[in-house]
């Protein structure tokens, strides 16, 4: 997957189109990413037993995963770009910006 944890991305489709955020977590097997402040849902949490020490129940707002095809990485210039790969002089695979050709 071309998007990793810590990348800054912009949402390119869906209800949150245009929103920017940082990738909190990536799920490569499911092709999804968790983006900070994007695709927020309300989750109903049951009251937990007091001996477990968990927080009380209620409605919690949290981020839900979004498909990787609906986000685009933002390069150093602040513009969205596609991601490509190249090998550096040591033979290591490096991600590059398709728009500028620079390393990400």
Curated annotation (Swiss-Prot):
Record's keyword annotation contains Ribosomal protein: yes
Keywords, alphabetical: Ribonucleoprotein, Ribosomal protein, RNA-binding, rRNA-binding
One biological process term in Gene Ontology: translation
| One Pfam family from the record | ribosomal_L24
Q: Which GO terms describe its cellular component?
A: ribonucleoprotein complex; ribosome
Q: SMART domains, per this entry?
A: KOW
Reading the lineage from the top rank, the first entry is Bacteria
What SUPFAM superfamilies does this protein map onto? Answer: Translation proteins SH3-like domain
Any single GO molecular-function term of the entry would be: structural constituent of ribosome
Q: How does it assemble?
A: Part of the 50S ribosomal subunit.
What protein family is recorded?
Answer: Belongs to the universal ribosomal protein uL24 family.
Free-text function comment from the UniProt entry = One of two assembly initiator proteins, it binds directly to the 5'-end of the 23S rRNA, where it nucleates assembly of the 50S subunit.
The record's section on HAMAP family has: Ribosomal_uL24_B
Protein name per its UniProtKB record: Large ribosomal subunit protein uL24
């Amino acid at each position: 997957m071309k998007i990793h944890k810590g990348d800054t991305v912009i949402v390119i489709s869906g209800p949150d189109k245009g929103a920017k955020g940082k990738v909190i977590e990536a799920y490569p097997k499911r092709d999804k990413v968790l983006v900070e402040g994007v695709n927020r849902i309300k989750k109903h949490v049951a009251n937990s037993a007091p001996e477990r020490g968990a927080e009380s129940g209620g409605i919690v707002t949290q981020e839900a995963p979004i498909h990787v095809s609906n986000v685009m990485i933002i390069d150093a210039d602040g513009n969205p770009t596609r991601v490509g790969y190249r090998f550096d002089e040591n033979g290591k695979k490096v991600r590059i910006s398709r728009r500028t050709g620079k390393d990400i």
